[in-house]
């Protein structure tokens, strides 16, 4: 009734939502590694995920903590509401990566499952068109639950691994999701499709059912692991730029790759400009 759950830090992220779903609830933060990452790890890193765009990161979903200090003292930090008197120590500890204390319990916010959810895949022949679409969707007044981008190199890996139905010849795809009340979602989808078409989308596919929706998301969430099919090793980069600068930044990444003979795949949270260029290499090859 109070839309809260008390969990221990070792609980796997996805297991919490799986337990809540039959009752009509879920836990929002959904890192791509949610099948294996823990709530405690998420708290330590202040983890986000695809749905950060509309719902925020872990700190927006934690009300309180039970911690053990370096002196061995057990303390209750925060509480059951956001407006606990005093300093926001919960906010200080979330994202501290275990350097300030040991967390033993976490009070998290849970939310109702949306009445309606629509997942779309916009297919583009240029990275510029895809990235310009992202900023215009937000500028139009629509804030989707998620906007993710994958480029051609990543799509090759994802399809070989997951067979999610993504086109192998696209320069980029946008995985977009709208959720909320049924009428509102229908309006959001119409607006999103319109913006995609304005920016020369080859096609916008709307998941026909829950199974297809889950398959689209499986492709995205398994993307990092799938890269192992095209490269034995890679470095993950993590940076944030304004959405309006995505076209320029992605072009520069491409130019740098050409100049230095690098292979780089792009898979990232486009909606909030959170880039994850993956530099592919093989340490067994001299010089790489």
What are these regions (language model features)?
Residues 108-112, 118-287:
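C-terminal substrate-recognition/cap domain of FAD-linked oxidoreductases
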Residues 1-148:
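FAD-binding subdomain of flavoenzyme oxidoreductases
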């Amino acid at each position: 009734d109070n839309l809260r759950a008390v969990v221990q830090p070792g609980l796997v992220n996805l297991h919490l939502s799986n337990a809540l779903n039959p009752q009509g609830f879920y836990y929002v933060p959904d890192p791509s590694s949610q099948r294996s990452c823990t709530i405690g790890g998420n708290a330590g890193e202040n983890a986000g995920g695809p749905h950060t765009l509309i719902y925020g990161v872990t700190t927006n979903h934690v009300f309180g903590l039970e911690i053990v200090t370096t002196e061995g003292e057990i303390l209750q930090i925060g509480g059951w509401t956001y407006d606990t008197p005093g300093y926001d120590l919960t906010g200080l500890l979330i994202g501290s990566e275990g350097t300030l204390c040991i967390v033993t319990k976490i009070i998290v916010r849970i939310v109702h499952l949306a009445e309606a959810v629509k997942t779309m895949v916009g297919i583009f022949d240029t990275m510029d068109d895809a990235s310009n679409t992202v900023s215009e969707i937000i500028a139009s007044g629509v804030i989707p639950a998620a906007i993710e981008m994958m480029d051609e190199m990543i799509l090759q890996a994802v399809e070989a691994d997951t067979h999610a139905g993504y086109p192998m010849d696209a320069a980029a795809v946008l995985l977009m999701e709208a959720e909320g009340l049924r009428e509102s979602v229908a309006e959001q989808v119409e607006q999103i499709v319109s913006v995609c078409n304005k920016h020369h989308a080859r096609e916008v596919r709307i998941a026909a059912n829950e199974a297809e929706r889950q398959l689209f998301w499986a492709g995205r969430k398994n993307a990092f692991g799938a890269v192992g099919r095209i490269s034995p090793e890679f470095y993950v980069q993590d940076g944030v730029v304004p959405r309006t600068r995505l076209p320029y930044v992605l072009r520069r990444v491409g130019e740098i790759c050409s100049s230095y003979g690098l292979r780089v795949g792009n898979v990232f949270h486009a909606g909030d400009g959170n880039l994850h260029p993956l530099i592919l290499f093989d340490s067994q090859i001299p010089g790489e």
